[in-house]
């Protein structure tokens, strides 16, 4: 049985731990902070054998060197082949190596190229779990630091086509702020209203809203629904000079991202 556990880091990051019971060897996804990972390993008598990286930002990679030293340079470190990240031992690209396996973990991992947040961002799928870094958030998506709106929309559409039951393990607890924006653009979405209430209740108990699911994100995430009639109407109302424009999905997505950046 594959168990996935969150380690909290910084203000809102999640570092994901993958463990196939009954093994005590584990992998971590996007360890921006080595100290919290080491504390978790030692508290649970686990051995770190590998790291999975989604992109180059320091809050996702900052702990790699220290973890390598802690593990006496015995780690396998997977990450995107076209981003400059120190410590990667196994560079990955979905076209060249769409699938691979991990020691101590059952089943194959699928690699997805999901540029947008960064130029070389990748995601991982194993069984019913998606590790998508800063591409897809619950109720939102990542800022476009290096990619184009077209790239990000294509990446999100690729993720949205995964099976509905797929659990979404993103890297940040941004859900409440994302849902506040989502409700501003899609206020009559009953599924969104219900989810917002559940998310508020979880956060009041200091519980994570993650993982989400692909099914839920299809229903409530405005960045997966940029052509929805109400969302298009909200965009045109917000950008009043476009009130008579014909917006395709890319145009709507581009304006949604611009709106969210200044929300």
From Swiss-Prot:
InterPro entries: Clx_II_MBL, Glyoxalase_II_hydrolase, HAGH_C, Hydroxyacylglutathione_Hdrlase, Metallo-B-lactamas, RibonucZ/Hydroxyglut_hydro. SUPFAM superfamilies: Metallo-hydrolase/oxidoreductase. Its cofactor is Zn(2+). Its EC number is 3.1.2.6. Keywords: Hydrolase, Metal-binding, Zinc. One of its GO terms (molecular function) is hydroxyacylglutathione hydrolase activity. Zn(2+) 2 binds at residues 59-60, 134, 172. It comes from the Bacteria. Belongs to the metallo-beta-lactamase superfamily. Glyoxalase II family. This is Hydroxyacylglutathione hydrolase. It comes from Shewanella baltica (strain OS195).
